Every structure is written in structure tokens, then in C-alpha cells.
Amino acid sequence: MIGRITGTLIEKTPPVVYVDVNGIGYEIDVPMSTLYALPDTGARVTLFTHLVVREDAHLLYGFGTASERAAFRELVKVSGIGARTALAVLSGMSVAELAQAITLQESGRLTRVPGIGKKTAERLLLEMRGKLGADIGATPHAVPDSQSDILNALLALGYSEKESLAALKTLPEGLGVSDGIRQALKALAR
């Protein structure tokens, strides 16, 4: 498998770029976010890649960061999401925005992406729940240590992540874990 390519950028024709590596020109499909981040032609570039081998073609997909590639790999595992749709998702939002949409179960943000309807967005949210995190580089709800303990306690008590995060926002700074849990439960009871 080809995991990374470093070479000279010879052409940018959205959504494809061509990278010359020792006389071999690789055709690589990239999301628009990666395309816009690339330097002008003639510059040296490094792309993290994902190779798809089909009966009729070998397709190479490129990404500016390893976290984009990891998100792409998770997206194509969702039933009904192919490589083209996964590229469209990553063209329409950053990995952090995608992780946040999944965490907060915001199907409306996903339906703004061309090719993603309501049912596909809901399936994507269901199948990707909990799969994009710090290892992907997305921290959509980074919280201090004491607040993460409070969040974990609320989740263990059966509250949804969305409800728990909303309750955390009502807590004053510097609150201890036990007092924080108590106040968060009061906020959730309202």
C-alpha cells in the first residue's frame, strides 16, 4: 500500500493533483481543503495517501494531514458512503468540525454537504459515533481534567453527551469533581 507520497507538484486540476516522484506522475484525488492548502505548482509536497484497488482501477486519495486520512478511512467504512462522498464531506468541513457534528449528533451540518441526504447523515452519525477522537486530531469538546471527570460521571449515569456538555457549560470554573457532579445533576433536573 502507498501510505505517503513526497514529490514535485506538477498540476492542480480540482479535485485531482499530479505529483511527480522520480519521473513517475501520480494522479491523486484530494479534498478541496487539501487542494487549497497546497503550494503552487513546482513546489515539493508531501501527501498522506489511501490506495483503493478495484477490478478496473487503482485509485489514490491524498490528504494534507494524517488526521484527514484517518477520518476518510472511517467515513468509507460507513455503509452508503463511498470514496467520492467521503471526499465531499472532508471538502465541506474540517476533521474537527466533522467530529463535533458527530459528537453533538448534528445531522443538519452533514446534510449541507452535496451527496449527503437526511438518511445518509443519520446513518453516518450512528455508525461513526465515538470513532473520531484525539487519535484523529479532533478535540471538539476539550475540557479540563476535573470537568472530564464530571462529564464521564454524567455519561455513566446515562445522560447523553449533548446533555452532559450543556450541563458542564453551566458550571463555574475551578469547581471540584463532587461539587461539579452535584451542580450538573441539578442543572439537568431543571
UniProtKB/Swiss-Prot annotation:
Residue segments, region Domain III: 142-190
Oligomer status and interactors: Homotetramer. Forms an RuvA(8)-RuvB(12)-Holliday junction (HJ) complex. HJ DNA is sandwiched between 2 RuvA tetramers; dsDNA enters through RuvA and exits via RuvB. An RuvB hexamer assembles on each DNA strand where it exits the tetramer. Each RuvB hexamer is contacted by two RuvA subunits (via domain III) on 2 adjacent RuvB subunits; this complex drives branch migration. In the full resolvosome a probable DNA-RuvA(4)-RuvB(12)-RuvC(2) complex forms which resolves the HJ.
Lineage: Bacteria, Pseudomonadati, Pseudomonadota, Betaproteobacteria, Burkholderiales
A single GO molecular function term of this UniProt record: ATP binding
GO biological process terms on file: DNA recombination; DNA repair
Gene3D superfamilies xrefs: 5' to 3' exonuclease, C-terminal subdomain, DNA helicase RuvA subunit, C-terminal domain, Nucleic acid-binding proteins
Region (Flexible linker): 137-141
Organism: Bordetella avium (strain 197N)
Record's protein name: Holliday junction branch migration complex subunit RuvA
